[in-house]
Regions:
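N-lobe entry segment of adenylate-forming
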Residues: 1-64, 68-81, 144, 154, ...
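Conserved AMP-binding/adenylate-forming core of the ANL superfamily
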Residues: 48-106, 123-128, 204-206
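Conserved pre-ATP/AMP-binding loop-to-beta segment of ANL
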Residues: 48-50, 171-192, 196-197, 220-226
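ANL superfamily adenylate-forming
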Residues: 58-59, 138, 144-182
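Conserved AMP-binding A3 loop
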Residues: 62-67, 185-210, 336
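AMP-binding/adenylate-forming catalytic core of the ANL superfamily
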Residues: 122-125, 129, 139-141, 277, ...
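Conserved AMP-binding/adenylation subdomain of ANL enzymes
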Residues: 209-229, 234-275, 290
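Gly/Ser/Thr-rich phosphate-binding loop
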Residues: 274-279, 288-349, 363
């Protein structure tokens, strides 16, 4: 009976996938399951086997073995037990990828507690809101970040310093896991603004099984891959697809710690001989705009991205630099990955710019507001059929004649001007094709005549003036249509972004909402 990892081909996946086969990858079952055991302990029999390689922004390389994490996480589980922190209680971890981070995250899950990774660049307000929401018993962080977390009632702030490691060293390296598959394992916060905190997405230990869909068909992980994901493990991509999925399959994963530098990333990709790369769209754009990619030699055979669509110029850069297609992996934190491009599949044609096709076993449709399926090429909302009902993603899309899905922006990124419906994503994609545009964001702003008009925010090294603004308007109008272009153009030094690196159009809309509508 073939295993799902025996081939990356699309036809093989369609012919051999069955949901029950996902359980073949794990020691646990539907009753008893523990993520820490599945990702770490069962792979730790070889003391030298590397679990994670961390490329630090300062140039350091850190290699952590499965045995290192197994021992330290067991000690951390004992450390929690000594403090009276029991199953179901939350343990917040505000650390960059490091031995300490993995020890704490997997140790909390061994204990049966709930691990809560927090982004290390949160300020006091961002930390306070999330801590107030999840109510952890302890928050583990660095000395530099301890002040941001101090003074929160009911939370013990602990610094992961030499004294902490010395205390752990006195504790046993064995721990018997006793969690059920449906016990809570992780809280993960999406990358919203601190003023509008998204609810934590809560994952049980069973979630590691469903995650294999994305691992097998979204990132294309197979035994023997040398994997890398630079996204922070505080976010869904870095946590699920960059950490848990490869480790569960026993694959060494690489990651990035510290302030992001695209040149440092490319250096790590070359030195680690990475064969499978999964990153956010922003990471690829930054590699392109660095102008330094030509200095490196890569060994990548599978490449995927997520977070937001990639513009055409960056797709061309990926093809020229890595020599493999950029495979979109689409989903949301709430529903998981649902549309993929099957990296490594010789029999699957990747359509540049498309979201691909559904993962095996999932039913995905683009629907009108009344719930009926859209015709080919018609824009509607992407929905997933789960547990007897259609689950909305709040993303717009369309399906072409060949069954490929295409993204058309968030539902709130649609701009309706004088009755015309326009996509912010399409306008941004065209603007980014201009050689003098480094970054672009498009939103709808109030207009007394048209209801809304498109306003583009541009980051460019070129001097900003009216002539450049008109050039961009004409550039867009000639490539899209006579009505689909930015009637307003603003130049800015930088665009607001979410902590996950996505352009935060909501902040731009909020700022514009305070201005009175104008005629154009």
């Amino acid at each position: 009976m073939p295993r799902l990892t025996d081939s990356t081909d699309y036809a093989f996946a369609q012919a051999h996938f069955a949901p029950e086969k996902l359980w073949e990858f794990f020691d646990g079952d539907r009753a008893s399951l523990n993520i820490a055991h599945e990702c770490i302990d069962r792979h730790a029999t070889d003391a030298a086997r590397i679990a994670v390689r961390v490329a630090h922004a300062d140039g350091r390389d850190e290699a952590v073995t499965f045995r290192d994490v197994a021992d330290a996480s067991a000690r951390f589980a004992h450390w929690l037990a000594r403090r009276g922190i029991g199953p179901g209680e939350r343990v917040a971890i505000m650390l960059d990828p490091s031995h300490a981070f993995y020890a704490a995250m997997f140790g909390a899950m061994k204990r049966g507690a709930v691990a809560v990774p927090l982004f290390t660049l949160f300020g006091p307000e961002g930390v306070r809101l999330r801590v107030a929401d999840c109510a952890p018993r302890v928050l583990l962080t660095t000395a530099e970040k301890a002040e941001a977390a101090s003074g929160i009632p009911g939370v013990e702030v602990v610094v992961a310093d030499d004294a902490w490691w010395a205390e752990l060293a006195t504790l046993p390296t064995g721990w018997e896991v006793a969690t059920r598959a449906d016990d809570m394992a992780l809280f993960q916060y999406t990358s919203g603004t601190t003023r509008e905190l998204p609810a934590a997405v809560k994952h049980t230990h069973r979630s590691i099984v469903v995650l294999m869909l994305a691992a097998l068909y979204g990132t294309g992980i197979r035994p023997g891959d040398v994997f890398f994901c630079p996204s922070s493990p505080a976010w869904g991509h870095g946590l699920a697809h960059g950490t848990l999925a490869p480790l569960a399959l026993g694959v060494t994963t690489g990651t990035y710690a510290g302030r992001f530098d695209p040149v440092r990333l490319m250096q790590a990709l070359q030195e680690y001989r990475i064969t499978n790369l999964s990153a956010a769209a922003t990471h690829y754009r930054m590699m392109r705009t660095s102008g330094e990619a030509h200095r490196f030699r890569f060994a990548i055979s599978k490449l995927s991205f997520t977070g937001e669509p990639i513009d055409a110029e960056t797709l061309r850069f990926i093809d020229a630099t890595f020599g493999v297609p950029a495979c979109s992996m689409y989903g949301t934190t709430e529903v998981g990955v649902v549309l993929v491009n099957y990296p490594g599949a010789a029999d699957f044609q990747v359509k540049p710019g498309s979201l691909g096709k559904p993962v095996p076993g999932l039913r995905v449709e683009v629907q009108r507001a009344d719930g009926t399926p859209c015709a080919a090429g018609e824009i509607g909302e992407i929905k997933l059929f789960r547990r007897g009902e259609w689950v909305p993603t709040k993303d717009l899309g369309k399906v072409d004649e060949d069954g490929y899905f295409h993204h058309a922006g968030r539902a709130d990124d649609v701009i309706i001007s004088a009755g015309w419906t326009m996509s912010a994503v399409e306008i941004e994609d065209v603007l980014l094709q201009h050689p003098d545009v480094k970054e672009a964001a498009a939103i709808g702003v109030p207009d007394a005549v048209r209801g809304q008009v498109v306003k583009a925010f541009i980051v460019s090294p070129r001097a900003a003036d009216d002539a450049f603004a008109k050039e961009l308007q004409d550039f867009t109008r000639m490539r899209l249509s006579q009505h689909e272009y930015p009637r307003q153009v603003a130049f800015t030094a930088e665009l607001p972004k979410t902590p996950a690196g996505k352009i935060n159009r909501k902040l731009l809309r909020d700022a514009e909402a305070t201005s009175a509508p104008a005629r154009h």
